[in-house]
């Protein structure tokens, strides 16, 4: 394929994130790359797309910088660009865990498990595997038997763990996320919270799916990604669809954002049901005056009224 998507992070010291972000944006644009990079004093977190040649040049330049020389790049072949624009933004932290006291992964983090070791942990009855992603990511795809925290954002995870601490306190804990960066801090936080045996999947789900030993086995569904692809295949052994349509519960792997801009909830649904519900996740959202689906498809007032009448009749 002509294009590649890079997923990477590196905890290191960047003295002036704002100046670095400005320079790095210019560098990325010089290579015609598109994507999103976050920069903080604690390091860098990015996902980029470009031609094979351009992304290879980017990785070479990063590896030549002492701060990023051993960065682990997860590489996905792609048929087209996965992003439309290029952003490099300074932040106070790379991932937000909403902690009273921050965790430095360079000092405290869980043991790294390579894909084959992680697969063994999945099969171990004495190990609890916790998905460190958001609920909508889990619902599209996850490892078999993994715990699904009831959270809409990563910053809600510590509170959820505290509320359910008695279920996991005396267990071996293994965490996983998309590329590994969330687990660096989350696993370190677990150790600080008193959990004694904590490990994490090295390189995240993205690495597990490409590993020649595991080939994504024991993963069900697809992996949610934060770019135009929306999702990617992980299991190359025995693929299974687990996503369910928001409206009728049928198998589904198609994500949309609710058409109500004030809601924006991500839901799995078919084109038929999206059409039927005017892109809304609820009757209230379908009725919203700023409904983006209505605007995008240039629906007339009569067409909108007709569909809403059908939905309202079902609600009654």
UniProtKB/Swiss-Prot annotation:
The active site is at 177 (cysteine persulfide intermediate). SUPFAM superfamilies: Rhodanese/Cell cycle control phosphatase. SMART domains: RHOD. Pfam families: Rhodanese (PF00581), Rhodanese_C (PF12368), UPF0176_N (PF17773). It catalyses: uridine(34) in tRNA + AH2 + O2 = 5-hydroxyuridine(34) in tRNA + A + H2O. Keywords: Oxidoreductase, tRNA processing. One of its GO terms (biological process) is tRNA modification. GO terms for molecular function: oxidoreductase activity, acting on paired donors, with incorporation or reduction of molecular oxygen. The keyword DNA damage does not apply. Residues 123-217 form the Rhodanese domain. NCBIfam families: PRK00142.1-3. This is tRNA uridine(34) hydroxylase. It comes from Enterococcus faecalis (strain ATCC 700802 / V583).
